[in-house]
């Protein structure tokens, strides 16, 4: 069986052409199928969903069939219909199937003829902010648009199936202003694989009271969803909600290429694009199919440097003007502007464009700038690299969702005579311990033996140090002032700190 599910609807909104390529997954390569980062993000989502279910106890789970090849939408919907005959009921993964549209809701709470439709997401928010979902410009905040249209689709399908019911849509999100009131909250929800290699979560509590205070926030989004349905909010200027449902349902069921106009942001991050390591393999590139169809590109054109990999290029107007190759660009197209004493953003872009256009493979070195920078270095040179974690369900009492946890660093020294020394390292493997303050104290001891210049592996290290500084300020640890002074001496403030 096939249908337009909510995941397919979401994918189709990103670009309707993607839905055609995912329809034909045996033909087209998809980089997201092998992305470990996305798999890790999904694991956090599974944990939050299980945590959310416990806030609505007594629910009945509509379980997936063990064999995904016999996934029967109608059977799942029939199970849901049977449960809805009860006056009051809580259902996890309720299923609704009508007119080739299929959705499953994370949590459904039925009381008489009123239904709460609750979509659980691991995304965080501060509920006190006034413009979380709709900005001051009266438009949906772009980062929330996929979630809100997903919720609108679920509400729409549920109303089609239950026209006499009142449906209230909610997003259940992580409240980043709340703190865990128990230790080990994250570890109550263990991510595991079943024998069929499907990801699940094992819940390791006997009673909901073990979870402490609820760190989720439930937001009623009836008004926003209604405006999406009415066409007041659109995903694209030329496609309202009902048009999107019709178009994407047709693509899904009829399996045709919609020839949706290529758009810079979607094409730049298209998951159906093959990199050099995948070239020559059996599966085809959906990205190439689009450009051969819409722009009549030949295989030779794909070898020409395009605008899609120009560093930090974000202007969609270039593509709208038909400027797709670096060879077509002029300095005016990227608003070229020099900066005193450093390489500006657009200078950096133009260097890349010129060199690739002219087949110039020599490295660019700002010799004067580099020399001026190196003249400020003090030996020995210190190199630090951090390993950290950030999770929606905190590990420790008093910590907020998505707070940074720094559990490991390595420290190497480059001496003036050329010697490289692996000088220090730290790793905290103590279960249940909050490592951050011990981490930075160890780092202070490692780096306070001389005045050598400190190099961080990336901006990540600076971000972590600032996050720990914020945590220290809110703590009563005896050495807080010394550690804060140390952090301020080796880092620079960020927008959040």
Residue ranges and their predicted role:
Residues 1-115, 305-310, 315-343:
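Metal-dependent nuclease catalytic cores that hydrolyze phosphodiester bonds in DNA/RNA
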Residues 14-19, 239-300:
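Cysteine-cluster motifs in flexible loop/terminal segments that predominantly coordinate metals
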Residues 21-22, 128, 277-281, 319-320, ...:
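Short helix/loop capping segments that flank catalytic or ligand/cofactor-binding pockets
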Residues 83-226, 382, 388, 392-393, ...:
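Mg2+/Mn2+-dependent nuclease catalytic core
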Residues 209-263:
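Polybasic (Lys/Arg-rich)
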Residues 452-459:
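Short glycine-rich phosphate-binding loop at a beta-alpha junction
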Residues 471, 478-497:
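Activity-critical C-terminal alpha-helical subdomain
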């Amino acid at each position: 069986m096939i249908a337009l599910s909510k995941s397919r609807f979401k994918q189709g909104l990103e670009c309707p052409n993607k839905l055609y390529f995912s329809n034909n997954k045996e033909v087209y390569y998809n980089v997201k199928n092998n992305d470990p980062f996305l798999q890790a993000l999904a694991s956090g989502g599974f944990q939050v969903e299980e945590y959310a279910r416990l806030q609505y106890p007594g629910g009945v789970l509509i379980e997936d069939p063990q064999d995904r090849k016999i996934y029967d939408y109608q059977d799942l919907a029939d199970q849901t219909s049977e449960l809805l005959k009860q006056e009051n009921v809580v259902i996890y993964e309720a299923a609704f199937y009508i007119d080739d549209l299929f959705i499953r809701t994370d949590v459904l709470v039925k009381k008489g003829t009123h239904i709460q439709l609750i979509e659980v997401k691991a995304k965080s928010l501060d509920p006190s902010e006034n413009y979380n979902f709709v900005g001051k410009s009266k438009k949906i905040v772009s980062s929330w648009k996929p979630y809100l249209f997903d919720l609108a689709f679920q509400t729409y399908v549920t109303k089609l199936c239950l026209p006499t019911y009142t449906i209230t849509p909610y997003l259940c999100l992580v409240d980043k202003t709340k703190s865990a009131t128990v230790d080990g909250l994250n570890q109550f929800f263990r991510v595991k694989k079943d024998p069929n290699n499907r990801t699940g979560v094992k819940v390791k509590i006997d009673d909901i009271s073990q979870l402490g205070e609820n760190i989720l926030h439930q937001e009623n989004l009836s008004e926003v969803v209604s405006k999406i349905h009415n066409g007041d909010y659109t995903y694209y200027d030329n496609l309202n909600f009902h048009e999107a449902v019709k178009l994407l349902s047709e693509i899904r069921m009829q399996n045709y290429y919609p020839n949706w106009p290529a758009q810079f942001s979607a094409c730049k991050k298209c998951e159906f694009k093959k990199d050099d390591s995948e070239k020559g393999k059996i599966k085809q590139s959906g990205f190439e199919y689009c450009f051969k169809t819409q722009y009549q590109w030949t295989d030779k054109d794909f070898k020409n440097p395009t605008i899609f990999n120009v560093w930090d290029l974000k202007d969609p107007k270039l593509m709208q003007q038909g400027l797709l190759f670096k060879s077509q660009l002029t300095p005016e197209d990227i608003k070229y502007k020099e900066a005193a004493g450093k390489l500006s953003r657009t200078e950096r872009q133009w260097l890349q464009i010129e060199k690739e256009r002219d087949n110039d493979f020599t490295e660019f070195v700002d010799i004067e700038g580099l020399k001026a920078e190196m003249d400020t270095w003090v030996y020995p040179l210190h190199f630090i690299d951090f390993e950290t974690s950030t999770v929606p369900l905190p590990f420790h009492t008093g910590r907020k969702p998505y707070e940074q946890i720094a559990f490991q660093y390595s420290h190497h020294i480059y001496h003036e005579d050329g010697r490289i020394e692996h000088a220090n390292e730290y790793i905290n493997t103590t279960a249940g311990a909050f490592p951050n303050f011990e981490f930075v104290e160890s780092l202070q001891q490692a780096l306070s033996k001389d005045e050598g210049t400190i190099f961080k592996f990336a901006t990540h290290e600076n971000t972590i140090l600032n996050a720990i500084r914020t945590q220290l300020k809110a703590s009563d640890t005896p050495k807080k002032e010394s550690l804060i002074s140390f952090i301020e001496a080796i880092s620079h403030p960020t927008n959040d700190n």
